[in-house]
Amino acid sequence: MKLKLIVGLSNPINLYYNTRHNIGSWYIKFLAKKYKKNLIKNKKYCFYYIDVKIGDYYSKLVIPDTYMNVNGTIIYNITNFYKIYSNEMLIVHDDLDLDTGIARFKFNHKNSTHNGIKSIYKSFGAKCIFNTLRIGIGRPKLNKNINSYLLNNPSPKEEILIKKTITKCIKCTDVLIKKNKDHAMNILHKK
């Protein structure tokens, strides 16, 4: 599968990098590190990026450096500038509805309650179709405030599990690009 753009949804990383809600930016940083690349800041358009060759294709790795609810504007501007279709992008984000340690690909994504995804639909239009990689962070126990939960760091135990999950996701992204989505899903979705 050809992915020209891989985006990790994020709040500003200098303020929120280690938080649960910035799991997408963790993923991009880990992926860039795998390819021995350092992200470059585009100050004018508020994002970090780097190009990497995965298999036969180059993919642009991006972390928007804005608040989650306006990530869509950054992504839209990037796709317009580089002539990338929405179905050629993979959006990586945290997911409250998946337990910590679980991740799922979703192809031809159509809706979500995640503010970063809502922002993409707002910028691209409701009929926009793209692919996602959802990384579970679980829900807070004892009906804790969701915003507080999202904007806090995971526990050390959760962080270890999240990092293991991201490592597995990166391997599966390689399979997705170099082979096919069914093979990648079989590996990622296996317990």
From Swiss-Prot:
Site (Stabilizes the basic form of H active site to accept a proton): D94
GO BP terms, alphabetized: protein quality control for misfolded or incompletely synthesized proteins; rescue of stalled ribosome
Residues at the catalytic site: H21
Tagged with keyword ATP-binding: no
MF annotations from Gene Ontology: peptidyl-tRNA hydrolase activity; tRNA binding
Primary location group: cytoplasm
Classification via InterPro entries: Pept_tRNA_hydro (IPR001328), Pept_tRNA_hydro_sf (IPR036416)
Catalytic reaction(s) noted: an N-acyl-L-alpha-aminoacyl-tRNA + H2O = an N-acyl-L-amino acid + a tRNA + H(+)
Enzyme Commission code: 3.1.1.29
Record-level GO cellular component terms: cytoplasm
Keyword tags: Cytoplasm, Hydrolase, RNA-binding, tRNA-binding
Subcellular location: Cytoplasm
Pfam families per UniProt: Pept_tRNA_hydro
Residues the entry annotates as binding tRNA: Y16, Y67, N69, N115
UniProt site positions, description: Discriminates between blocked and unblocked aminoacyl-tRNA: N11
Cited function: Hydrolyzes ribosome-free peptidyl-tRNAs (with 1 or more amino acids incorporated), which drop off the ribosome during protein synthesis, or as a result of ribosome stalling. Catalyzes the release of premature peptidyl moieties from peptidyl-tRNA molecules trapped in stalled 50S ribosomal subunits, and thus maintains levels of free tRNAs and 50S ribosomes.
Family label: Belongs to the PTH family.
HAMAP family attached to this UniProt entry: Pept_tRNA_hydro_bact
Assembly behavior: Monomer.
Name under which the protein is recorded: Peptidyl-tRNA hydrolase
Record organism: Wigglesworthia glossinidia brevipalpis
